[in-house]
């Protein structure tokens, strides 16, 4: 039993966590975008990917600009976002794909 716990602890500490910050324009209102992102099916999808949404915010200077901070396994969110097949899914939320600024950090 002790050996199992030790190996599980090692797995947890060895996994690289990525924090991904997306800054982008919206094609709809911030409230519509936020509602979409917090919807049960959207959150279920993130949960299946091991991704958590830590922050969804609207720019004070431009109400059509939003920032979202995600955290999850390295490359998961980035790879999905960079896949051209994901573009229609991303844009269905109101997120304008073109011009999105992506900042990535690992820990």
How should each PLM-predicted stretch be described?
Residues 1-84, 98-107:
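Short S/T/G/P-rich N-terminal loop/turn motif that feeds into the first structured element of a domain
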Residues 88-94:
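C-terminal structural segments of small proteins and small subunits
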């Amino acid at each position: 039993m002790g050996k199992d716990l030790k190996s599980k602890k090692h797995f947890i500490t060895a996994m690289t966590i990525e924090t991904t910050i997306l800054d982008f324009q919206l094609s709809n209102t911030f409230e519509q975008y936020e509602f979409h992102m917090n919807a049960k099916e959207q959150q279920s999808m993130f949960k299946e990917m091991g991704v958590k949404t830590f922050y969804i915010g609207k720019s004070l200077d431009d109400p059509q600009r939003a920032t979202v901070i995600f955290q999850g396994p390295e490359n998961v969110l980035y790879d999905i976002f960079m896949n051209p097949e994901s573009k229609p899914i991303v844009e269905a939320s109101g997120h304008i794909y073109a011009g999105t600024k992506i900042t990535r950090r690992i820990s």
